[in-house]
Amino acid sequence: MGLVAIYPGPRTSLGDPKNSVYPYLLKGLEITRPNQVWAVDITYIRLPTGMVYLFALIDWSSRFIVAWTLANSMTADHGVETLEKALVFGVPDICNADQGSQFTGAEWITFLLNLNIQISHDGVGRCIDNVRIERFWRTIKYEDVHLKQYQTIKEARKGLGQFINHYNYQRPHQALYYERPADIYFAGKQIGALPSQQYKEVLLQRGQLEFAFRPLVTHSLHSPIPA
């Protein structure tokens, strides 16, 4: 009948009382442009051999997934790796995360501070504070992961890349007045502002090119995104 059992998964946001927690900066903030706020989070994907973990960064304004990483652990270095990938698109003013140890520990905090990124953390138990990425998790789980039942991390990486590419570049989004996330994110950007060929080759080697760089025809008028 095509039914899929969904079992409870591991907690991905366990805190550490020794780590640094910053205030939540998004309450009452008017978010009007791409690269003003990015949000990061982790979700799990169950394979026959065990769990793998999907890290993703979403641009709050456009819903564009600026970077993602699929890893066999949920340690902080994979969060930093994901942010490093995203920096080809620019540096956000604010990056919001939950209070998991990956995003409150020294490795993550130091990396953001060195880039002059303002750090924002959700309140304890308040997943609604990071609602953009939570809604994306719901979308990718129910429209891709639960339907395809990936068997290997290689298969999952390829399939997730194809889905994220579709989500970014082809799928109209109701909250964006049926624009695509990429149309909003890249509106007014020149080709020179897009990732370099060298970086494309790096992603190709990692098997993640599918999600990132498809030629985009912008079909609406928007204000230019600050470089």
What are these regions (language model features)?
Residues 50, 68-90, 94, 101-104:
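Active-site beta-loop-alpha junctions of metal-dependent nucleic acid enzymes
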Residues 15-17, 97-99, 103-112, 119-141, ...:
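RNase H-like two-metal-ion nuclease catalytic core shared by retroviral integrases
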Residues 63, 95-98:
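Buried hydrophobic side chains on well-structured beta-strands
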Residues 1-34, 180-191:
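Basic, flexible linker segments flanking DNA-binding modules
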Residues 113-115, 139-227:
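C-terminal domain-tail junction helix/linker
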Residues 64-68, 119-122, 146-147:
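Short small-residue beta-strand/loop micro-motif enriched in glycine and branched aliphatics
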Residues 31-66, 72-73:
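An active-site-proximal beta-strand-loop segment
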